[in-house]
Structures are given as structure tokens and as C-alpha cells.
């Protein structure tokens, strides 16, 4: 029987760590391509005929594969030995399992997932991780070790089952960051129970309740984060993560006066499979049989990361009978007059190739929702649907995988928290392992490749 202490002998285990920002710097194909990452290796997906999900290994990956960990007392070698932060996932549902798959696909992550809290126990957790109706079969080797532990490709992960965060063994396991994925503990007192239990930081994977919890959207305001800002932060909602990046572009380039948004959103676990009681009478109706109008705070929440837009945006959601992938339809009045649809799309293309690379994409191909399944981008602009009316009214449509894409941003935010951790900041690499090596060894033969 594995004990809690068995997973916590080393406070912060050492591991080879590559570029912290590499997770946000990718090489992309033209038009409607997704991050060129071998998704099939860890999600079990098969690409459609329209979009390629898998890729060849990049030069960066080839270099990374050749790096070795620095032995104790040995001379410097390529590869920085830095600490990893221990992570707990509280709530092993859709976002919790997507987060684990996304994290598993990043070999350079500064995070070490050591435990999940799941009310179903080891058998349920491993089965649902391995076999997923949306993602397909997880290609990793998932095994049950005992009734408290499972492994992914040999990496042990503990399973605990307790609905009360105060009773979770975060102190005993030395947990640094909790990924709060239950959707229940979204305010200060609730999420704060993880801190009381011994965790250092909490990332809420939902909109937070209360003005005391800062919200961050990667690509929009994540640079505002600092280790001492707060111990509890929110990654906002999937829809806010889709909306905020391209709204930022529109406001910076054209100036937003006001606007409304509709998200046509796949049904979620908060709805009923068959008609049944629910506090929202519309969500009480069968999710797979109806278009369900409901509320969303996504548009208003944009002002949490773009304060200048407070009071300028609002919207609703239409829940539809699809299990995954959603689409935002935004209509705004703009200050700049005389623009064309191509002007708007070019602004998005510029941002997608620059400051929002890896977060925003532009698609020129007439695709449908399933083609955006497992897209790593927060939002993908459907350029053919961009419209301009009267020179000062703009309509933009953007696709997003409300599970996978959102979970990638949760990993990004957790990486950012790790990279800002006191004592680890100096260990952050440049984003290119060869570049880091050449800074200290400019005369090395390999470094001449970059001269």
C-alpha cells in the first residue's frame, strides 16, 4: 500500500528543464493549422482530411532529446538541472483529465503532477483517462499500481478521494500548486481551503467569484502576474479565453465602442442528459435534444483582463447538441471608420504571427466544428465569416475547443506560476536549449551554426 509520504521524500525533485517559454513559441503551418505537436502520441486523436494534427519532430525537439541531466558534482553539460514544482489536480473531470494529457505532452514542463483528488477512486480515474469519448484512447501506458496509485509511462501519480479540501494531504505531499477543477471551490474561502491544507498556490479553472481573486488570460494579461500578487488566481472561462485575445486586437487596432457576443457552445456536464430538475429551467431540458439559451459571463469577464472595456461588452450562450468545440460570434461598433473585412483579418494575422502566436490563429478554409477538435489555440478566426457593415460595425466569428484548448492555457498559466517562483526564476531558459548552451560556450563548434 503506497503511503502519502512515499511520494514526498523530496520537496522539489530535480529534473532536466528546457525552455519555459517554448510552450508558447511554435512553428505553424499556413491557413488553418494547429500547433505542430504530436497530439496523437498522447491524446489518441486521428486527424480529419482537412487539418493535420500530427507533425514531424522539430529541430528544437531533436536538440532537446540530446540534452542530459547534470549529475551531482559533474562538470557542466548541456541541459540545466532545475527544480520542478509539485502539482495536485483537484477534480478529475473533463478539465482535470484534459489538463493531465496536455501536461503529459510537454516534456519540458516545470511541473510535476503527483496526485489527483477524484471521488471515483483509482479504477474510475484510470479508465476515464485512458478511454475518452472525445479525445480517443490515451496512447500513454496507463497502469494501476495499487488502490491508491496509478502510473503514466512509469510516472506514479497518487489518487486520493475526499470532497473536503481541508482534509487533503497537500502538506504531507509537499504540494506547490493545486489545479482546482471541480467548479465548486471558485471563491476565496473555498479555494483557500487548499492553502489551509498546505498548498502554496491555487489555479481555478473557471471564472472566480469575488474581486479578491485576479484573473489571467494567456496572451492578454499574463504578464501582470507576479508571485506575490495572490496565492489564488483564476484562468477565467473557456469562452473568455477565446474572446479576450481577438477582442484585444480589435480594441488596439480599431477601438471598440460597444458590442454583443453569442457563443454557440457544446453542452457541458452542468446540463441534464434527460429532462430533470435544475436551478436554470432551460438547462433542465435534455442537452442532446435541444438548443438551450442560457447566460454567460464571458463577455463581461473580458473587462477583468482588459479593464478599458468595462461596460462595453455583453452576451449570451446557446448550448447545442454537440459534445465539444464551440464558436463565438462577436459584433462590435468601432471608433475607426472605413475599414474592410480584409483590414480586420489582416490585423488578426499580424497578431497571430506576433504577440499572440500560439494563442490566436486565422483559418481561411471553410471548416466545421469537428475540424477544430483538439486545437491548441484559444481562438481561431474564421476569416471568411468576418463582416463589416457601414464601415464601423464589425462581425467576427472564432472557433475554440472549449476543453482541450482551454486546458492548454491552464498548463501555460501553471508554467508561468512556476517560472515566477522564488528561487526558480534564475533557472528559466531562453526558449532554445542550444542558445542557452552557446551563451556560456560561444566557442563550441555547434554554436557556429548560429553565426
Swiss-Prot record:
Pathway: Carbohydrate biosynthesis; Calvin cycle. Gene3D superfamilies: Dihydrodipicolinate Reductase, domain 2, NAD(P)-binding Rossmann-like Domain. Residues 1-83 form a transit peptide. Disulfide bonds: none annotated. It holds the Pfam family Gp_dh_C. One of its GO terms (cellular component) is chloroplast. Keywords: Calvin cycle, Chloroplast, NADP, Oxidoreductase, Plastid, Transit peptide. This is Glyceraldehyde-3-phosphate dehydrogenase B, chloroplastic. It comes from Spinacia oleracea (Spinach). The gene is GAPB.
Amino acid at each position: 500500500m503506497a503511503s502519502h509520504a512515499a511520494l514526498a521524500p523530496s520537496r522539489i525533485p530535480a529534473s532536466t528543464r528546457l525552455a519555459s517559454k517554448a510552450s508558447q513559441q511554435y512553428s505553424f503551418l499556413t491557413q488553418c493549422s494547429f500547433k505542430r505537436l504530436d497530439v496523437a502520441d498522447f491524446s489518441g486523436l486521428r486527424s480529419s482530411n482537412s487539418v493535420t494534427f500530427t507533425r514531424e519532430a522539430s529541430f528544437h525537439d531533436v536538440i532537446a532529446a540530446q540534452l542530459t541531466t547534470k549529475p551531482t558534482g559533474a562538470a557542466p553539460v548541456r541541459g540545466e538541472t532545475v527544480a520542478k514544482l509539485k502539482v495536485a489536480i483537484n477534480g478529475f473531470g473533463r478539465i482535470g483529465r484534459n489538463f493531465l494529457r496536455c501536461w503529459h505532452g510537454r516534456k519540458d514542463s516545470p511541473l510535476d503532477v503527483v496526485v489527483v483528488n477524484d471521488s471515483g477512486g483509482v479504477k474510475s480515474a484510470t479508465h476515464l483517462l485512458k478511454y475518452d469519448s472525445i479525445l480517443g484512447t490515451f496512447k500513454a501506458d496507463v497502469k494501476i499500481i495499487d488502490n491508491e496509485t496509478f502510473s503514466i509511462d512509469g510516472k506514479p501519480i497518487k489518487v486520493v478521494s475526499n470532497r473536503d479540501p481541508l482534509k487533503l494531504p497537500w502538506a504531507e505531499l509537499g504540494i506547490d500548486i493545486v489545479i482546482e477543477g471541480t467548479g465548486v471551490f471558485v471563491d476565496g474561502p473555498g479555494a483557500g481551503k487548499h492553502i489551509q491544507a498546505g498548498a502554496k498556490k491555487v489555479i481555478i479553472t473557471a471564472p472566480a467569484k469575488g474581486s479578491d481573486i485576479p484573473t489571467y488570460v494567456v496572451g492578454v494579461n499574463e504578464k501582470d502576474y507576479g508571485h506575490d500578487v495572490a496565492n489564488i488566481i483564476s484562468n477565467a472561462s473557456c469562452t473568455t479565453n477565446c474572446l479576450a485575445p481577438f477582442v484585444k486586437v480589435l480594441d488596439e487596432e480599431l477601438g471598440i465602442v460597444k458590442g454583443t457576443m453569442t457563443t454557440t457552445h457544446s453542452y457541458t456536464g452542468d446540463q441534464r442528459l434527460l429532462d430533470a430538475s435544475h436551478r436554470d429551467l432551460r438547462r433542465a431540458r435534455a442537452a442532446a435534444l435541444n438548443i438551450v439559451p442560457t447566460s454567460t459571463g464571458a463577455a463581461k469577464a473580458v473587462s477583468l483582463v482588459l479593464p478599458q472595456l468595462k461596460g462595453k461588452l455583453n452576451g449570451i450562450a446557446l448550448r447545442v447538441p454537440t459534445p465539444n468545440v464551440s464558436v463565438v460570434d462577436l459584433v462590435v461598433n468601432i471608433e475607426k471608420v472605413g475599414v474592410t473585412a480584409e483590414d480586420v483579418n489582416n490585423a488578426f494575422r499580424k497578431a497571430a504571427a506576433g504577440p499572440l502566436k500560439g494563442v490566436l490563429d486565422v483559418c481561411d478554409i471553410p471548416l466545421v466544428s469537428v475540424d477544430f477538435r483538439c486545437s491548441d489555440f484559444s481562438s481561431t478566426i474564421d476569416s471568411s465569416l468576418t463582416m463589416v457593415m457601414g464601415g464601423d460595425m464589425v462581425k467576427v466569428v472564432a472557433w475554440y475547443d472549449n476543453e482541450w484548448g482551454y486546458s492548454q492555457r491552464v498548463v501555460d498559466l501553471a508554467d508561468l506560476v512556476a517560472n515566477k517562483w522564488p528561487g526558480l526564476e534564475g533557472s528559466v531558459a531562453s526558449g532554445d536549449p542550444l542558445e542557452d548552451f552557446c551563451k556560456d560556450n560561444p566557442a563550441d563548434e555547434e554554436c557556429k551554426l548560429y553565426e
